[in-house]
Amino acid sequence: MDSNTVSSFQDILMRMSKMQLGSSSEDLNGMITQLESLKLYRDSLGEAVMRMGDLHSLQSRNEKWREQLSQKFEEIRWLIEEVRHRLKNTENSFEQITFMQALQLLLEVEQEIRTFSFQLI
């Protein structure tokens, strides 16, 4: 993962953690946790691709990796829908910018995970 993506993740997570969205702050914390989890998962897939010999250990260590991959795509789709929903419902420009950048980052992460997974299949 390049340094721009790392700083984008860190910047978005920091800004999202500073948002006060009233009763939905628990939902926002959940989104932040899921975004961090997806980042780690994407990083681990990228590392496995870099060490193609890891493919066999990845498959033998975790026979359900395709199921996990499917679950991660479901999480990404849910997060994308949640971010779009929040983007439509906020009038605060700080929140709009943050959610637009989070949406762009989620789409990039989805594409990277898809690319890595095709290389591993």
From Swiss-Prot:
Keyword Transport: yes
GO BP: exit of virus from host cell nucleus through nuclear pore
Keywords assigned by UniProt, alphabetized: Host nucleus, Host-virus interaction, Transport, Virion
Subcellular location: Virion; Host nucleus
Name assigned to this protein: Nuclear export protein
InterPro entries xref list: Flu_NS2
Gene3D superfamilies, alphabetized: 1.10.287.230, S15/NS1, RNA-binding (1.10.287.10)
Chief location bin: virion
Residue span of motif Nuclear export signal: 12-21, 85-94
Superkingdom classification of source: Viruses
Complex and partners: Interacts with protein M1. May interact with host nucleoporin RAB/HRB and exportin XPO1/CRM1.
Function: Mediates the nuclear export of encapsidated genomic RNAs (ribonucleoproteins, RNPs). Acts as an adapter between viral RNPs complexes and the nuclear export machinery of the cell. Possesses no intrinsic RNA-binding activity, but includes a C-terminal M1-binding domain. This domain is believed to allow recognition of RNPs bound to the protein M1.
HAMAP family, sorted: INFV_NEP
Family of the protein in this entry: Belongs to the influenza viruses NEP family.
GO cellular component: host cell nucleus; virion component
